[in-house]
Regions:
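Flexible loop/hinge segments that line or gate small-molecule binding clefts
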Residues: 35-43, 47
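Hydrophobic/aromatic beta-strand patches that form the interior of the parallel beta-sheet core
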Residues: 5, 30, 49-51, 88
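Hinge/cleft segment of the Venus flytrap/periplasmic-binding protein
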Residues: 57-102
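Short, well-ordered coil/turn elements that cap or connect secondary structure elements
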Residues: 24, 44-45, 82
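Hydrophobic alpha-helical
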Residues: 1-37
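Electropositive phosphate-/nucleotide-binding environments in soluble metabolic enzymes
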Residues: 8, 53-56, 60
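Short beta-strand elements at the ligand-binding edges of bilobed clamshell
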Residues: 44-56
Length: 102
C-alpha cells in the first residue's frame, strides 16, 4: 500500500496506525474535512492533504434556499450553488482561506 484516501470516518485511526508503524514516508494519506487532530497529523507529516468542503456553508445554503422557497415564497436564482473547496497541505494548513473566497 502506498496511498490511502479516506472519505468518511476513520481518519484518526488510519493516521494513528500509519504513524505507529512508522510508515508515513511510504504511505500517502488524503482525507476530507479538517479538524484539530487532522491538522496535527498534517503538521507531523502523517496526513499529506486535506480536502476541506466547508460543510457549515453547505448546510446553511441548503436550508436557506429551502426556507426561501417554502416560507419566503422567493424564486431560486440558480439550479446549482457552489461552495468553496480548499486543499490544505503542511505548507498552508494554518492559513485562513476565508479571505480567498470569491
Amino acid at each position: 500500500i502506498n496511498g490511502i484516501f479516506i472519505a468518511g470516518y476513520g481518519i484518526k485511526g488510519v493516521a494513528k496506525a500509519v504513524e505507529v508503524k512508522n510508515r508515513s514516508k511510504e504511505i500517502k494519506i488524503i482525507c476530507y474535512d479538517n479538524s484539530a487532530f487532522v491538522t496535527d497529523y498534517v503538521k507531523k507529516g502523517v496526513i499529506d492533504a486535506v480536502i476541506c468542503q466547508d460543510p457549515e456553508k453547505q448546510g446553511y445554503m441548503a436550508l436557506k434556499i429551502l426556507s426561501d422557497l417554502i416560507i419566503g415564497d422567493k424564486e431560486v436564482k440558480a439550479d446549482t450553488y457552489m461552495t468553496s473547496i480548499d486543499i490544505r497541505l503542511c505548507e498552508n494548513i494554518d492559513r485562513d482561506f476565508q479571505e480567498w473566497e470569491i
